[in-house]
Amino acid sequence: RPGGTAVINADDPFSGLWREMNAGRRTLTFGLDQAADVHGRAEPKALGCVLSIATPQGVVDVALRVPGRHNARNALAAAAAALAAGATLAAVSGGLTSFAGVKGRLQIRQAVGGALLIDDSYNANPDSVRAAIDVLAATPGRKILVLGDMGEIGGQAGQFHDEIGGYAKSQGLDLLLALGEHSELASRNFGAGGQHFESVDALLAALLPQLGGDTALLVKGSRFMRMERVADAVAANGATGNGVH
């Protein structure tokens, strides 16, 4: 709108186009990889990261309670938008520090047997599955991926699922337990440690004995697969818990 501020992702390959489209407006850029008005440096920690944010108002270190490099970039976007709207740096820091994630989106929960559950069951596409696998791969202990089908990805669904299986193996995951027609291709390409199941009950029967204090578990799948059935079944506090952050 006239007099508004355009908040632009400097890491976006089309950021130059966005700048051109907003010529004459005030702009505020953010980024992790490129120089920006709001620039971040992320230091991964267990189940989160420390994000150092340099802004026109100064520098602040924020302990994010959500994992993943993509969430660090999301935090920078939120910081830039808030600063553009007139928020103070202290308010931005407080807001980011207090954010504990959203149910089913890389939500950290305690699982039975003392295992760590990364509940990312709300939805899935190839990019978000890779991002979630990266989070699991950086988590200590044995690593198990429970993968449901990815939906609405067109005629290349088979290829995309196959590639996810290979990516999971390349990232050092120990087990891939698959549910759904296309996810069977992921389990096959994963190789040793990959298994496909016809039902949630069969999958749970194989999964539960694998859970222990040295285990990290990621549950991921598209909305229509209802993978929260798996996440809630293995969560120590069941479906009604808010998770552990």
Question: Which role does the model predict for each range below?
Answer:
Residues 1-21, 65, 151-152, 156:
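Flexible active-site lid/hinge loop adjacent to a nucleotide/diphosphate
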Residues 43-50:
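A short, compositionally biased
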Residues 23-26, 36, 47, 56-61, ...:
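ATP-dependent carboxylate-amine ligase
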Residues 52-54:
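A generic structural motif
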Residues 29-33:
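Short beta-strand elements of ligand-binding domains
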